């Protein structure tokens, strides 16, 4: 029985300048690895057996009502502008209206070459597909806006990277796939009518109360400020914050070489291609602001009097650091038991982070221990911790039920790098048990009792670098 879904493909109704229509490249022998039943139910996707799901979510068969296309965009990559990028290995099947009334994109990643593939094969291998599946679902469970994983399928075909690897396809669900780079390409080309139509579309879809291009900018800046504060509160490092990986929806998108830090250090970098540390953990707020400045530059091109609008756009972007700081303070305050932190609490939070850096304490486990037991064992210099702890307990004396506040803000488990690599290595050999175990724990991160997955890596297990690896 053919899979059905409530498709309503608004992007496909825009002019062809925004995309190229094409179908996924069929694969030889698809098989289903995982399917996200609760998400599928929200999307209104009909029931089907594993074989039918494998066929549809590998791109071998189109669901009824799909309008497949590859989207066009540009982007700054590590600060350098690339005037044309686009979906080089992804195809948007279409949009569905979920049972919650929201509009969602359904996209296949690894679905074959497109006109934007730039000599690539358009495919993905199993490792990055499973990484994004687990990490994006973990982020959702952690309360951070994110694209989500609907399905993972094997293609039955190999892909050639440094070696021969099993091919796979990820079905990704997003509020949309509009990026900063989507606006940049039409501003760069001076296609002002297209830029205006794209802006109107984005406002209608993501910021219906926004007043024109600058209203959209204000809404996106606010969403991105909340997003990056969420990352910082979890020790998450995106790794490739290019403008083509910056979503207008304010969702985390394109996980690539992402990672969660183990030992806390503000300068942590994992991405093998980030040689200068541009996207280091501590730089993420600054880069988010920089990306929004690029969005402002693109949006201004359509204004009747762009010079007059520059001042307002500048004020909007310059307000972002304060927005990020406020969102960060709120999240970090809760992690130490303060339900409504004020700027006066910043030294207390920063004092703990400084101590964690000096003592090489584990980021996730330190906050978990504060919430549920005694964090003293996380530190080598316990006298220094005791000094901080005295100030902390004095502050908590005014709080109601701080343990509950902390436990709701501090996960017990994250998808640690060494566990992700372990999961991928096993899956390549046909063993999906580690994937299923990690996924189960990370989708209930505040309640898991899997102490083994909570454990930081040993010296031999540390993963020093991550790779896009697509």
Curated annotation (Swiss-Prot):
KW Magnesium (keyword) present: yes
UniProt: Mg(2+) binding residues: 245, 254
Record's keyword terms, sorted: ATP-binding, Magnesium, Manganese, Metal-binding, Nucleotide-binding, Nucleotidyltransferase, Transferase
Positions that bind ATP: 86, 88-89, 109, 121-122, 172, 179, 254
Entry keyword Metal-binding: yes
EC number: 2.7.7.-, 2.7.7.108
Active site residues of this protein: 244 (proton acceptor)
Cofactor(s) the record lists: Mg(2+); Mn(2+)
Any GO molecular function: magnesium ion binding
Short name of one Pfam family: SelO
Domain of life per record: Bacteria
Annotated catalysed reactions: L-seryl-[protein] + ATP = 3-O-(5'-adenylyl)-L-seryl-[protein] + diphosphate; L-threonyl-[protein] + ATP = 3-O-(5'-adenylyl)-L-threonyl-[protein] + diphosphate; L-tyrosyl-[protein] + ATP = O-(5'-adenylyl)-L-tyrosyl-[protein] + diphosphate; L-histidyl-[protein] + UTP = N(tele)-(5'-uridylyl)-L-histidyl-[protein] + diphosphate
InterPro entries: SelO
Protein's job: Nucleotidyltransferase involved in the post-translational modification of proteins. It can catalyze the addition of adenosine monophosphate (AMP) or uridine monophosphate (UMP) to a protein, resulting in modifications known as AMPylation and UMPylation.
Family listed: Belongs to the SELO family.
Protein name: Protein nucleotidyltransferase YdiU
Species, as recorded: Roseobacter denitrificans (strain ATCC 33942 / OCh 114)
Gene: ydiU
């Amino acid at each position: 029985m053919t899979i059905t879904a409530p498709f309503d493909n608004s992007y496909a109704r825009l002019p062809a300048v925004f995309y190229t229509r094409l179908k996924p490249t069929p694969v030889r022998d698809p098989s289903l690895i995982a399917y996200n039943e609760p998400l599928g139910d929200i999307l209104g996707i009909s029931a089907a057996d594993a074989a039918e799901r494998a066929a549809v979510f590998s791109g071998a068969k189109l669901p009824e009502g799909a309008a497949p296309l590859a989207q066009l965009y540009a982007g700054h990559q590590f600060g350098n502008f690339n005037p044309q990028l686009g979906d080089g290995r992804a195809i948007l099947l279409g949009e569905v209206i979920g049972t919650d009334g929201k509009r969602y994109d359904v996209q296949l990643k690894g679905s074959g070459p497109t006109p934007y593939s730039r000599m690539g094969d358009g495919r993905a291998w199993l490792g990055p597909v499973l990484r994004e599946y687990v990490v994006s679902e973990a982020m959702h469970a952690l309360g951070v806006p994110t694209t989500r994983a609907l399905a993972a399928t094997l293609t039955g075909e190999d892909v050639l990277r440094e070696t021969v690897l099993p091919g796979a396809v990820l079905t990704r669900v997003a509020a949309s796939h509009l990026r900063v780079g989507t606006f940049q390409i039409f501003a760069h080309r001076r296609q002002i009518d297209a830029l205006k139509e794209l802006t109107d579309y984005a406002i209608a879809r993501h910021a219906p109360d926004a007043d024109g291009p600058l209203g959209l900018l204000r809404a996106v800046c606010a969403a991105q400020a909340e997003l990056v504060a969420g990352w910082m509160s979890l020790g998450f490092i995106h790794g490739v914050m290019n403008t083509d990986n910056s979503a207008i929806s304010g969702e985390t998108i394109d996980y690539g070489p992402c990672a969660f830090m183990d030992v806390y250090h503000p300068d942590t970098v994992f991405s093998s291609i980030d040689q200068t540390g541009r996207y280091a953990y501590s730089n993420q707020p600054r880069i988010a602001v920089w990306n929004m400045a690029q969005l402002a530059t693109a949006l201004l091109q359509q204004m009747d009097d762009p010079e007059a609008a520059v001042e307002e756009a500048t004020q909007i972007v310059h307000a972002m650091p304060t927005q990020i700081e406020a969102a960060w303070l709120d999240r970090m305050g809760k992690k130490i038991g303060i339900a409504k932190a004020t700027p006066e609490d910043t030294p207390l939070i920063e004092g703990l982070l400084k101590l964690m850096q000096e003592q090489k304490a584990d980021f996730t486990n330190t906050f978990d221990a504060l919430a549920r037991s005694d964090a003293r064992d996380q530190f080598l210099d316990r006298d220094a911790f005791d000094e901080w702890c005295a100030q902390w307990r004095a502050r908590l004396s005014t709080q109601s039920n701080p343990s509950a506040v902390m436990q709701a803000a501090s996960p017990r488990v994250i998808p640690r790098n060494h566990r992700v690599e372990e999961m991928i290595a096993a899956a390549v050999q046909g063993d999906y048990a580690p994937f299923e175990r990690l996924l189960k724990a990370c989708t209930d991160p505040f309640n898991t009792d899997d102490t083994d997955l909570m454990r930081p890596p040993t010296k031999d297990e540390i993963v020093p670098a991550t790779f896009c690896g697509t």
